[in-house]
Amino acid sequence: MKEKRDLKVQAIESGTVIDHIKSGQALNVLRILGISSAFRATISFVMNAPGAGGKKDVVKIEGKELSVEELNRIALISPKATINIIRDFVVVQKNNVVLPSYVEGVVRCTNSSCISNSSEPIKSKFSVIQSEEEGVSLHCLYCEHVISEEIAENLL
């Protein structure tokens, strides 16, 4: 029996497709990118779509190409995501996100005693570690606190 495959989300003329997002993280990707109801371009997303490696999310953004900083933020919550740049309905560039080794001012330290959470004008600073067993974790350079599970919830 032949399996029927339908296109679930309309193709975009130009913009960005973020594929292979960790399942359940599409809304966090939109938040990372600062996309809200005020954003006027077309945005499509699919959550929990079947993929070769299990379930995944996909986000399509019409008329927007992502900056390096935006890609770094996405990598923190979905290090296996791929970015496709679309022009005239054709993929002109395809890249994997690259997990940065260091981030500054991107995530709030969850240690309430950390100096980056005080009234001082200090941006948070983290070294980024990835392991097969534990995934992505952030190590605060000020207080040495480790964040792993709640990265998405503490993005600035």
Swiss-Prot record:
GO MF annotation, one: metal ion binding
InterPro entries: Asp_carbamoyltransf_reg_N, Asp_carbamoylTrfase_reg, Asp_carbamoyltrfase_reg_C, Asp_carbatrfase_reg_C_sf, Asp_carbatrfase_reg_N_sf
Keywords annotated in UniProt: Metal-binding, Pyrimidine biosynthesis, Zinc
Database matches in Pfam families: PyrI, PyrI_C
A biological-process GO annotation: 'de novo' pyrimidine nucleobase biosynthetic process
Binding residue positions for Zn(2+): 109, 114, 140, 143
Any GO CC annotation of this UniProt entry: aspartate carbamoyltransferase complex
Keyword match rRNA processing: no
HAMAP family named in the record: Asp_carb_tr_reg (MF_00002)
Family (UniProt): Belongs to the PyrI family.
Functional summary from the UniProt entry: Involved in allosteric regulation of aspartate carbamoyltransferase.
Quaternary structure and partners: Contains catalytic and regulatory chains.
Listed name of the protein: Aspartate carbamoyltransferase regulatory chain
Organism listed in the record: Methanosarcina mazei (strain ATCC BAA-159 / DSM 3647 / Goe1 / Go1 / JCM 11833 / OCM 88) (Methanosarcina frisia)
Encoding gene, per UniProt annotation: pyrI
